[in-house]
């Protein structure tokens, strides 16, 4: 049963106008497309007790149209044989997944932990083919903030996106959350300059910056996104767009916008802000992407 979503005339007009900024995201699919056309995303995370984080990211990637999704868990054995509700997602250990070929993009860090195995996993992802796009989130960012070798590998990654919340940004900069929030523009620019990455500084009016672009200020979203797992979903959305061939900066900006706009769709359709669960975001983003594509 598909959820029923709708938007008012003004919301439709506003969202269609914004979508014009993301031409690679909102385009019709060719009739002769196949799963290989839309790329393979690898999601690595999920230390013991945190298996749900990569599931949220991987399922979001499926909802946003990725051709194939693999999920790797930072555990010695798989936490489950198949993901209930998402049998399409192929499972592996994090160590096993980092050795696989045929990956177009990565989302790493969701519930990963910061133990030695986690550090090795992030390093292995960054040391692969430097043309593979990489999203680092959550614990992968915490590892970057403390491990010099991993930071050096990150600087050599051509297509790198970092998605810190203010506390993670503060750790990357060696400063405080208050200082990050006092000048978010300076913070997002500085992180990008230090690590040579596109940076998505999450929060109210998420900022996206790359070294050669102006800062994108995201206007979508509402307080419903303040829920556990929301960031994992964002990482999956951005990773999915990268795997599908969307350019790095556009994928970061469009991912942030779709993530927030999905929450706006849910609020307008069902009146839900408080109590929104992270798993409800991606189905709304899927609906929105398809509705916009058909409307343009």
Curated annotation (Swiss-Prot):
Q: Which HAMAP family match?
A: NADHX_dehydratase
Q: State the protein's name.
A: ADP-dependent (S)-NAD(P)H-hydrate dehydratase
YjeF C-terminal domain residues are 18-292
Q: What does this protein do?
A: Catalyzes the dehydration of the S-form of NAD(P)HX at the expense of ADP, which is converted to AMP. Together with NAD(P)HX epimerase, which catalyzes the epimerization of the S- and R-forms, the enzyme allows the repair of both epimers of NAD(P)HX, a damaged form of NAD(P)H that is a result of enzymatic or heat-dependent hydration.
Superkingdom of the source species: Bacteria
- UniProt catalytic activity: (6S)-NADHX + ADP = AMP + phosphate + NADH + H(+); (6S)-NADPHX + ADP = AMP + phosphate + NADPH + H(+)
Cofactor(s) named in the record: Mg(2+)
Q: Name one GO molecular function term.
A: ADP-dependent NAD(P)H-hydrate dehydratase activity
Residues binding AMP, per UniProt: 202-206, 231
What quaternary structure, including any partners, is listed in this protein's UniProt entry?
Homotetramer.
What species is given as this protein's source? Neisseria gonorrhoeae (strain ATCC 700825 / FA 1090)
- Kindly list the positions annotated as binding (6S)-NADPHX: 53, 113, 165, 232
In which family does this protein belong, per the annotation?
A: Belongs to the NnrD/CARKD family.
């Amino acid at each position: 049963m598909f959820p029923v979503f709708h938007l008012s005339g003004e919301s439709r007009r506003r969202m269609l106008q914004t979508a014009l900024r993301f031409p690679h995201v909102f385009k019709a699919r060719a009739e002769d497309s196949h799963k290989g056309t839309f790329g393979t995303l690898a999601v690595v995370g999920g230390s013991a007790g945190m298996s749900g984080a990569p599931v949220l990211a991987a399922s979001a990637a499926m909802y946003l149209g990725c051709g194939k999704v693999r999920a790797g868990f930072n555990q010695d054995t798989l936490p489950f044989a198949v993901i209930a509700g998402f049998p399409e997602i192929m499972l592996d250990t994090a160590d096993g997944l980092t050795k696989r070929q045929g990956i177009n993009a990565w989302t790493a860090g969701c519930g990963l932990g910061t133990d030695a195995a986690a550090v090795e996993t992030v390093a292995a992802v960054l040391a692969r083919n430097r043309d593979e796009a990489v999203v680092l989130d959550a614990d992968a960012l915490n590892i970057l903030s403390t491990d010099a070798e991993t930071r050096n590998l990150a600087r050599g990654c051509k297509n790198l996106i970092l998605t810190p919340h203010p506390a993670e940004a503060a750790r990357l900069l060696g400063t405080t959350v208050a200082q990050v929030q006092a000048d978010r523009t300076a913070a997002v620019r500085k992180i990008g300059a230090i690590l040579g990455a596109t940076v998505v500084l999450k929060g109210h009016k998420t900022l996206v910056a790359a070294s050669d672009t102006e800062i994108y200020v995201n206007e979508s979203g509402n307080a419903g996104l303040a829920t556990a797992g929301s960031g994992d979903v964002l990482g999956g959305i951005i990773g999915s767009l990268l795997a599908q061939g969307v350019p790095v900066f556009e994928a970061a900006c469009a991912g942030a916008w779709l993530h927030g706009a999905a929450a706006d769709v849910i609020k307008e359709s069902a009146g839900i802000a408080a109590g929104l669960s992270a798993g409800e975001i991606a189905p709304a983003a899927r609906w929105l992407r398809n509705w916009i594509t058909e409307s343009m």
